[in-house]
Amino acid sequence: MNSRPSNPTKLVIRSSTLLFCGVVLIHLFAAQIDAQRSTSRWQTLNGDAPLVIARGGFSGLYPDSSIAAYQLATLTSVADVVLWCDLQLTKDGLGICFPDLNLANASTIDRVYPNREKSYSVNGVTTKGWFPNDFSLTELQNFLLIRGILSRTDRFDGNGYLISTIEDVVTTLNREGFWLNVQHDAFYEQQNLSMSSFLLSVSRTVSIDFISSPEVNFFKKITGSFGRNGPTFVFQFLGKEDFEPTTNRTYGSILSNLTFVKTFASGILVPKSYILPLDDEQYLVPHTSLVQDAHKAGLQVYVSGFANDVDIAYNYSSDPVSEYLSFVDNGDFSVDGVLSDFPITASAAVDCFSHIGRNATKQVDFLVISKDGASGDYPGCTDLAYEKAIKDGADVIDCSVQMSSDGVPFCLRSIDLRNSIAALQNTFSNRSTSVPEISSVPGIFTFSLTWPEIQSLTPAISNPFRVYRIFRNPREKNSGKLISLSQFLDLAKTYTSLSGVLISVENAAYLREKQGLDVVQAVLDTLTEAGYSNGTTTTKVMIQSTNSSVLVDFKKQSKYETVYKIEETIGNIRDSAIEDIKKFANAVVINKDSVFPNSDSFLTGQTNVVERLQKSQLPVYVELFRNEFVSQAYDFFSDATVEINAYIYGAGINGTITEFPFTAARYKRNRCLGREEVPPYMLPVNPGGLLNVMSPLSLPPAQAPNQDFIEADVTEPPLSPVIAKAPTSTPGTPSTIAQAPSGQTRLKLSLLLSVFFLSLLLL
């Protein structure tokens, strides 16, 4: 898949008309879905589930405050989702929804009216831009809404979305549940435009549920104007050091007097850091008492700043659902609502994953297979990565077997140590070699170092998205120790929660022919020594390889399950290839793009590869699942859970291979999948749905069809015999035939004898 610097969507969406029809359908069974939602006692002020508030609609995908963004929010969220509108006033006193006082920040106004930029004092700061109060509503219809955050996709900027009045939004959506945010009442008052007068007028035709503002005087003006059944007033806190413009007090000082806030508001809206602050390294520190204090004062607490495509605390492992749960279901308190650019994720967190323990009933059955353990949280293939994968709920942990020069099989993702080890080049630069059979560039390969040397190395966490400045768990970037295959198998035996282990074997032919190392036999011997071949453990063993010859060799010598990995991205698989695979494999691994192909990170459709393999009784496992939003197609809303749902509930795969086992394991306990009516925020995506609502001029380039996988791609000659290799000594290290540590697999006796007799002949 093409990596991208931002965000995605879900659901069956084909056109604007279908979007509107979907809104009607949501209303038809909203009551039924609401009745099915969790009735657990929430620690909110009133005991109800936290509200999901869609900031500008679904602004994480579509331009903020566009009709399409509001429609998509209603389609993919809880039935009572509240739609947020940043209220601005035009020159002719009409109210529009727009996210910023400067219209140029999320529209094309600067291209249409390049000479109408002006300067104003906004809260005492001279600000240049294009301001709503300088344009009539008619003039505002001459330019288009576009993304306001440049890191997000620009593919919907050409869809022709216009600025909407509040009445437009209400009429189009035909629903209640609106939150009007008045960010700059004092500014508009200086321009002789009255927010309070407009709100009183529009409230006669529009149902307003919430009104928020960061200005105290605004609330003092409108208090008592709406009557008993009027909207809920919510005071918005900005940065603690920022000054509230009408009292000249910092928001931090106002926070210390919540009883004062209670005199004019029923709730507060605060940034996430007010409740769960971070330290300088982006890790969580203990939560504040703000929620409990506000609830004691009778104030509801709403939290802003939620988006799937921004950096979050490292504690969440790039999983936005985990972040929401830390605010709504942490055992100490629940906030009363969350303001999100991605309301689908907030909806799922609140309704599908809250109040679910680790022992909750599983609603769906598939294998969670680790990739080098929990390698998104710790250096891969270390003891800590494997232990966390088991703790996080992996069904199967994996070991990519490499061989040391002294014949010890151990776990490491790559045969080139530089890909997994810190500061390796400085220590063993003299071991760098060129091996065209393995890599087009020189490397420091595992078979060039002894096992004691490898044990002395410092592992390094992988950072596959470094180019986007997205890093993994820096505090633990070098934690843990590498372990041998024997240690890996011993670890797996001690956990009854594991159903199996997956052992990956690659480069077997090269190791036999050029290094005199028989990785197949080394794996078999180690399994026997660990008790996996004689029935002393019930843990299932799966052997994986991209080489059919390797799996054929294992099949001849053992009864372990074999898994054939198809490296290529394929669009179809021929019957003859499937029949050939069935001769030596019990299951197949394919990559994500072989299920859902994409163009420029937009799904283009779905292949029949999974269906064809499963019809031939071959389970299908898919890799590689990661939590970082840049690893996912836009269609998945920058949410790893939405992606998993598409592959499990949508494509019906049999297992996920993931660097973040916790996210996949939690999905199994997804409460919403056990309901008679699955809610819209847990329906699988429609592959290609986003392309169908994209302007033809904005479509990504068409991709050539992925290849068919044929029998010739499967068939390989048998593995060559092991070639005896004369022992060599590395500088300052023991001979490569030195005895392996106790408990580790040694070189086969036959190989040692061959080397001995060869040396006699050379004398």
Curated annotation (Swiss-Prot):
Main subcellular location: membrane
GO terms, molecular function: calcium ion binding; glycerophosphodiester phosphodiesterase activity
GO biological process per UniProt: glycerol metabolic process; lipid metabolic process
Keyword Membrane set for record: yes
Extracellular side: 36-744
Residue ranges the record marks as coiled coil: none
UniProt KW keywords: Cell membrane, Glycerol metabolism, Glycoprotein, Hydrolase, Membrane, Repeat, Signal, Transmembrane, Transmembrane helix
Membrane-related topology note: Single-pass type I membrane protein
Recorded family membership: Belongs to the glycerophosphoryl diester phosphodiesterase family.
Protein name as annotated: Glycerophosphodiester phosphodiesterase GDPDL1
